[in-house]
């Protein structure tokens, strides 16, 4: 599968590296294809780098891994993505009164906002619930950690669930894209524990089921 990863910073490079290892063709979509660290990333993973609209055009799946502050302009500049599967890994974070908070909350979500920017695409919210370090660390756990996903198109969710599983996670369907309203605040639990409560970044969420 050709996967276009829009953004090649921590999240984008982690996801692209993981799926390259799983055998997918990775195309990083960036503003500057000549950056030294990007060239090193492509050499390490076998990926290629193109201007973001060109990468998105070529991808069977398009992954959005951008800072929320620049997301709207960058996504709208991608061009016609009609029918494409879009993975939204972004959390709508912003600084408010000196603290990191969600810009959107329980009455709307970043996932729904992305879907409104791309009304003819099939948007699936996932990979927003842990830090970049854990996104390709699923196979390091004795029991696969959980990664929820939300979207309105069941066929798209099936494809995305397979991609989630390939990175070592137990993919669980949270429902329609409206459920991004709970997945994005859920991500704040990881951020709070990892960055402010001393747990560190080397952990993920799991689902425990009773024996028998």
Q: What does each model-found stretch correspond to?
A:
Residues 49, 122-128, 172-174:
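General beta-strand structural signal in soluble alpha/beta enzymes
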Residues 14, 18, 117, 163:
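Rossmann-fold NAD(P)-dependent oxidoreductase module
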Residues 145-212:
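Active-site-lining helix/loop region of Rossmann-like oxidoreductase modules
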Residues 46, 50-98:
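Rossmann-like NAD(P)-binding element
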Residues 1-45:
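NAD(P)+-binding Rossmann beta1-loop-alpha1 motif at the extreme N-terminus of oxidoreductases
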Residues 90-133, 137-139:
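Rossmann-fold NAD(P)-binding glycine/threonine-rich loop
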């Amino acid at each position: 599968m050709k996967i276009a990863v829009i953004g090649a910073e921590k999240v984008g490079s982690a996801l692209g590296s993981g799926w390259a290892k799983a055998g997918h063709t990775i195309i990083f979509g960036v503003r500057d294809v000549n950056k030294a660290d990007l060239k090193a990333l492509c050499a390490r993973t076998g990926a290629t780098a193109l201007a973001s609209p060109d990468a998105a055009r070529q991808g069977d799946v398009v992954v959005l891994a951008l800072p929320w502050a620049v997301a709207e302009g960058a996504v709208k500049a991608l061009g016609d993505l009609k029918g494409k599967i879009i993975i939204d890994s972004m959390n709508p974070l912003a600084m408010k009164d000196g603290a990191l908070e969600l810009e959107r909350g329980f009455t709307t979500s970043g996932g729904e906002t992305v879907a409104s920017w791309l009304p003819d695409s099939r948007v699936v919210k996932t990979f927003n619930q842990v830090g970049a370090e854990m996104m390709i660390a699923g196979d390091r756990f004795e029991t696969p950690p959980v990664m929820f996903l939300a979207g309105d198109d069941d066929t798209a969710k099936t494809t995305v669930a397979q991609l989630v599983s390939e990175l070592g996670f137990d993919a669980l369907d949270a429902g329609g894209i409206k459920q991004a309203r709970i997945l994005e605040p859920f991500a704040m639990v990881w951020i709070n524990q990892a960055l402010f409560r001393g747990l560190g970044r080397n952990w993920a969420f799991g689902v425990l089921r009773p024996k028998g």
